[in-house]
A protein has these predicted regions:
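Short beta-strand segments
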Residues: 52-88, 103, 114-115
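Short, conserved active-site entrance elements at the starts or edges of catalytic domains
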Residues: 22-68
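Hydrophobic membrane-insertion alpha-helices, especially the h-region
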Residues: 5-23
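Residue-level signal for well-ordered alpha-helical segments
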Residues: 6, 10, 36, 52, ...
Protein backbone atom coordinates (compact mmCIF):
# COMPACT_ATOMS: atom_id res chain seq x y z
CA UNK A 1 0.00 0.00 0.00
CA UNK A 2 2.82 2.37 0.87
CA UNK A 3 4.54 1.72 -2.49
CA UNK A 4 1.26 2.47 -4.27
CA UNK A 5 1.01 5.85 -2.51
CA UNK A 6 4.57 6.68 -3.58
CA UNK A 7 3.81 5.68 -7.16
CA UNK A 8 0.64 7.80 -7.23
CA UNK A 9 2.58 10.70 -5.71
CA UNK A 10 5.33 10.42 -8.34
CA UNK A 11 2.80 10.28 -11.20
CA UNK A 12 0.94 13.28 -9.78
CA UNK A 13 4.18 15.26 -9.34
CA UNK A 14 5.20 14.45 -12.92
CA UNK A 15 1.78 15.54 -14.22
CA UNK A 16 2.07 18.86 -12.35
CA UNK A 17 5.61 19.34 -13.67
CA UNK A 18 4.42 18.79 -17.27
CA UNK A 19 1.48 21.18 -16.77
CA UNK A 20 3.79 23.89 -15.43
CA UNK A 21 6.43 23.33 -18.14
CA UNK A 22 3.93 23.21 -21.03
CA UNK A 23 1.34 25.70 -19.78
CA UNK A 24 3.33 28.30 -17.88
CA UNK A 25 6.89 28.18 -19.19
CA UNK A 26 6.20 27.47 -22.86
CA UNK A 27 2.58 28.64 -23.10
CA UNK A 28 2.61 31.90 -21.17
CA UNK A 29 6.27 32.92 -21.17
CA UNK A 30 6.93 31.76 -24.77
CA UNK A 31 10.72 31.88 -24.59
CA UNK A 32 12.99 32.02 -27.63
CA UNK A 33 15.68 29.36 -27.70
CA UNK A 34 17.63 31.18 -30.43
CA UNK A 35 20.71 33.18 -29.45
CA UNK A 36 20.33 36.86 -30.34
CA UNK A 37 23.79 37.08 -31.91
CA UNK A 38 22.77 34.43 -34.47
CA UNK A 39 19.72 36.26 -35.79
CA UNK A 40 20.05 36.92 -39.50
CA UNK A 41 22.38 33.95 -40.04
CA UNK A 42 21.63 31.52 -42.87
CA UNK A 43 21.06 27.84 -42.07
CA UNK A 44 24.64 27.10 -43.25
CA UNK A 45 26.08 29.82 -40.99
CA UNK A 46 24.09 28.47 -38.03
CA UNK A 47 25.37 24.94 -38.63
CA UNK A 48 28.96 26.16 -39.02
CA UNK A 49 28.80 28.10 -35.77
CA UNK A 50 27.03 25.26 -33.96
CA UNK A 51 25.93 27.15 -30.84
CA UNK A 52 23.04 29.28 -32.12
CA UNK A 53 20.28 27.44 -30.30
CA UNK A 54 16.96 26.62 -31.95
CA UNK A 55 15.83 28.89 -34.82
CA UNK A 56 12.48 30.49 -33.93
CA UNK A 57 9.53 32.15 -35.67
CA UNK A 58 6.88 34.31 -34.04
CA UNK A 59 3.63 33.25 -35.69
CA UNK A 60 0.64 35.57 -35.64
CA UNK A 61 -2.74 34.13 -36.60
CA UNK A 62 -5.89 36.16 -37.18
CA UNK A 63 -9.09 34.31 -36.35
CA UNK A 64 -12.47 34.72 -38.02
CA UNK A 65 -13.60 37.08 -35.23
CA UNK A 66 -10.61 39.39 -35.92
CA UNK A 67 -8.62 38.47 -32.80
CA UNK A 68 -4.90 37.74 -33.10
CA UNK A 69 -3.10 34.82 -31.51
CA UNK A 70 0.68 35.10 -31.39
CA UNK A 71 2.95 32.21 -30.50
CA UNK A 72 6.70 31.58 -30.55
CA UNK A 73 7.66 28.36 -32.35
CA UNK A 74 10.78 26.50 -33.34
CA UNK A 75 11.27 26.55 -37.10
CA UNK A 76 13.12 24.51 -39.68
CA UNK A 77 14.11 25.99 -43.02
CA UNK A 78 14.40 23.27 -45.63
CA UNK A 79 13.77 22.95 -49.39
CA UNK A 80 12.91 26.67 -49.71
CA UNK A 81 10.18 26.28 -47.08
CA UNK A 82 9.71 27.13 -43.43
CA UNK A 83 8.35 24.30 -41.29
CA UNK A 84 6.83 24.40 -37.82
CA UNK A 85 5.88 21.40 -35.74
CA UNK A 86 3.04 20.92 -33.29
CA UNK A 87 4.69 18.42 -30.97
CA UNK A 88 3.38 19.54 -27.58
CA UNK A 89 0.07 18.87 -25.87
CA UNK A 90 -1.00 22.44 -26.52
CA UNK A 91 -1.55 22.87 -30.24
CA UNK A 92 -4.44 25.29 -30.59
CA UNK A 93 -2.21 27.48 -32.76
CA UNK A 94 -1.93 24.60 -35.26
CA UNK A 95 -5.69 24.31 -35.73
CA UNK A 96 -6.11 28.10 -35.80
CA UNK A 97 -3.43 28.41 -38.51
CA UNK A 98 -5.09 25.71 -40.63
CA UNK A 99 -8.47 27.41 -40.26
CA UNK A 100 -7.02 30.81 -41.20
CA UNK A 101 -5.11 29.51 -44.22
CA UNK A 102 -2.62 32.39 -44.01
CA UNK A 103 -0.47 33.64 -41.14
CA UNK A 104 2.11 36.32 -40.43
CA UNK A 105 5.54 35.17 -39.33
CA UNK A 106 8.43 37.18 -37.94
CA UNK A 107 11.93 35.80 -38.42
CA UNK A 108 14.94 37.90 -37.39
CA UNK A 109 12.78 41.05 -37.25
CA UNK A 110 11.42 40.51 -40.78
CA UNK A 111 7.61 40.18 -40.97
CA UNK A 112 6.32 38.03 -43.83
CA UNK A 113 2.96 36.60 -44.89
CA UNK A 114 2.71 32.83 -45.37
CA UNK A 115 0.21 30.35 -46.79
CA UNK A 116 -0.26 27.35 -44.49
CA UNK A 117 -0.09 23.74 -45.73
CA UNK A 118 -0.24 20.58 -43.60
CA UNK A 119 2.67 18.22 -44.25
CA UNK A 120 2.05 14.51 -44.89
CA UNK A 121 3.75 11.46 -46.38
CA UNK A 122 7.38 11.52 -47.45
CA UNK A 123 7.71 15.25 -46.86
CA UNK A 124 6.49 14.74 -43.27
CA UNK A 125 9.11 12.05 -42.67
CA UNK A 126 11.95 14.17 -44.12
CA UNK A 127 11.01 17.12 -41.90
CA UNK A 128 10.47 14.94 -38.81
CA UNK A 129 13.91 13.37 -39.37
CA UNK A 130 15.47 16.87 -39.38
CA UNK A 131 13.57 17.87 -36.20
CA UNK A 132 14.04 14.83 -33.95
CA UNK A 133 12.47 14.70 -30.50
CA UNK A 134 14.88 13.00 -28.11
CA UNK A 135 13.71 11.03 -25.08
CA UNK A 136 14.61 13.82 -22.59
CA UNK A 137 12.64 16.35 -24.67
CA UNK A 138 9.63 14.03 -24.92
CA UNK A 139 9.87 13.46 -21.15
CA UNK A 140 9.74 17.24 -20.49
CA UNK A 141 6.67 17.48 -22.74
CA UNK A 142 4.86 14.61 -21.04
CA UNK A 143 5.10 12.23 -24.01
CA UNK A 144 2.65 14.16 -26.22
CA UNK A 145 0.60 12.68 -29.07
CA UNK A 146 2.14 12.30 -32.53
CA UNK A 147 3.35 15.57 -33.99
CA UNK A 148 1.70 17.52 -36.77
CA UNK A 149 3.77 19.67 -39.13
CA UNK A 150 2.90 22.75 -41.17
CA UNK A 151 4.77 24.15 -44.14
CA UNK A 152 4.71 27.93 -44.41
CA UNK A 153 4.96 29.10 -48.03
CA UNK A 154 5.91 32.77 -48.34
CA UNK A 155 3.33 34.87 -50.18
CA UNK A 156 4.30 37.73 -52.53
Amino acid sequence: MRAMKWLIGLVAAYAVFVLVFEGVYLGLMQPSFEKAECQGFTQAQRRARGDCGIPMIQLSIESTNQTRQTTMLARLEMDDGVYVSAHHWTRGWYHAALAAGEVDGEIDGQLRRYAVEPVVGGEFQRVADRMPLSLPVRFLMGFPPERQILRLDELP
